[in-house]
Each structure stands twice: as structure tokens, then as C-alpha cells.
């Protein structure tokens, strides 16, 4: 594999990661499919995917840095719901949402890693698509939590339970959490924001664990390739998040569900 070829693969996968990480279409599923298509599926490929996820995480930090600092009591500018002891997004909301997936993820880590194949992704794309449709069809007519600061601890925990579905490669963490939030009475926009903020500790924890298990696959010769993938994922994810938060004010998740079904069909024709 030539250096130029490696950089091209890094760029392509960086675009795929950044574009799909926070959309309800499954970045992992797309990375597995595109990785197999490019023939980049060895242990280094798995480590590379972990590294470029950090670029996507950084994009969320840049977008929501005020909120993230606010969770630990550091506020810049006006404090949401100032003077109230309730009605404000707190660190406890995030911790409650993390617990279910963290527990199951640690218990079934090795089993989950064994599911990283296109065939498994195909099934999860379809089931995740139906969950998006269910969220649109069965959500309350009037959301009980319109904004991010209206989300209750119970809703946060239930969103965390839905997040467990994303342990199945190809399901989509954002798709599971946003759909779960909507079914629990959270507005589409607030559920999306909560999903993005929740992604920071969840993805960071998973990334650190994966890096710990695969650090011996890293070498200085891979730094340029990893750097290209990281930067590309960061830039594309930043654009994708901003665009996504704009369009969900005007459209439902039905187009994303249809897209998932189409991708599942392509996977069936190519890999089955």
C-alpha cells in the first residue's frame, strides 16, 4: 500500500466518519461497509477508526463547549434557568444516561466486537430504521420537554436505555438516543442536542478503552494517515452537526429511515 493510497483511504474514511457519526444512519455501519469495500479491515483499520472518532468528538466539544462546561458548574454568559434548583441540564442527567450502555458495554465488549461484519450491519440498519419511523409515528403530539433544560432525570435514564441498542454495530447511537428521547416526550431538536452532548463522554470512554486494547498496533509510520483521518473527520463532523440541527427543524426522520433501508438493500446485494 503506497503512502498516497493510505492518505486517500484516510481521507475517504474521515469523510464517512464525520458525515455519519451524528446522523441517525450509523457511522459504524458505514465504516464497516466502506472499509470492506476499500479492503481496509485489518487490526490497524480498527485502531484507525478509533483514532478518527476522536476528531468527531472534538467537533461536538467545539459546538457545545458552553454546555459541557456548564455541566461541571462553569458558566460563560447567562446561566439557563438561573436561580432555580431544577429545570436545568445537569451532570446527573448525563451520568444517568450513561449507566445502562456502560454496564452492558463492559460486560459484552468482546461479543460486540465480534459483530463487526456487513451482514450484522444490514439487520441493524433495518431495525434501526423502523425505530426512527416508530419515533415519528408514536411520539406525543406535544413534547413534554421542548428544550434541553426541560429534560427530566427519568427521561435521561430512558434515553440511556435506548442507547444500549447502539451496542449492536450498525444501529446508530444517535438514532437510538434521539428516537428514545422523542418516544419519551422530548422534542426532536432537544433530543438531538442531548444525544450530541451525551456522545462526548460515551465515545471518549469507548475510545480510551479501545485504544488501551489496541495501542500496540500503533506506529510512527501511521501518524500521517491517522492525522489526515482525524482532521478530516473533525471538519466534516462540525459541518454535519451544524447542518443537521438546522434541517431537523423542518423535516422528520422518515427520510433517514428510508436511507437506512436503501443502504441495507445495497449491503444485501453486495455482501450476501
Curated annotation (Swiss-Prot):
It is found in: Cell inner membrane. Its main location: membrane. It is a multi-pass membrane protein. One of its GO terms (molecular function) is undecaprenyl-diphosphatase activity. It catalyses: di-trans,octa-cis-undecaprenyl diphosphate + H2O = di-trans,octa-cis-undecaprenyl phosphate + phosphate + H(+). Its EC number is 3.6.1.27. Pfam families: BacA. GO terms for cellular component: plasma membrane. GO terms for biological process: cell wall organization; peptidoglycan biosynthetic process; regulation of cell shape; response to antibiotic. Keywords: Antibiotic resistance, Cell inner membrane, Cell membrane, Cell shape, Cell wall biogenesis/degradation, Hydrolase, Membrane, Peptidoglycan synthesis, Transmembrane, Transmembrane helix. It comes from the Bacteria. The chain crosses the membrane at residues 6-26, 45-65, 92-112, 115-135, 189-209, 221-241, 251-271. InterPro entries: UppP. Catalyzes the dephosphorylation of undecaprenyl diphosphate (UPP). Confers resistance to bacitracin. Belongs to the UppP family. Bacitracin is thought to be involved in the inhibition of peptidoglycan synthesis by sequestering undecaprenyl diphosphate, thereby reducing the pool of lipid carrier available. This is Undecaprenyl-diphosphatase. It comes from Pectobacterium atrosepticum (strain SCRI 1043 / ATCC BAA-672) (Erwinia carotovora subsp. atroseptica). The lineage of its organism: Bacteria, Pseudomonadati, Pseudomonadota, Gammaproteobacteria, Enterobacterales.
